[in-house]
Regions:
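Short, charged recognition helix plus adjacent turn
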Residues: 2, 10, 15-16, 35, ...
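DNA major-groove recognition helix of helix-turn-helix/homeodomain DNA-binding modules
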Residues: 46-61
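Short coil turns linking two alpha-helices in DNA-binding domains
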Residues: 18, 29-32, 44, 58
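Recognition helix of helix-turn-helix/homeodomain-like DNA-binding domains
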Residues: 28-42, 65-67
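The alpha-helix within a helix-turn-helix
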Residues: 12, 23, 52
Length: 70
């Protein structure tokens, strides 16, 4: 089973942005962004929307839609 819920780390790299940049934009602790990027925890929906706007992508682009658990 795929365990990565979000693709934040991948999208940040594609957009040539860093964790530090994102934490500064969102005014959150760097460890929070690090946890999101490693899928240790997940941003809430309003934060996910903010991230998508900052990175100029759809929210869907930040989510791993291939998670299947049958």
């Amino acid at each position: 089973m795929e365990t990565d819920i979000n693709r934040l780390k991948v999208v940040l790299a594609e957009k040539k942005r860093t964790n530090k940049w994102l934490c500064e934009q969102l005014n959150v602790n760097p460890s929070t962004v690090s946890k999101w990027c490693t899928n240790s925890s997940q941003p809430d929906l309003p934060t996910l929307v903010k991230i998508s706007r900052l990175l100029e992508v759809n929210v869907d682009d930040l989510l791993n839609t291939k998670i299947v658990d049958f």
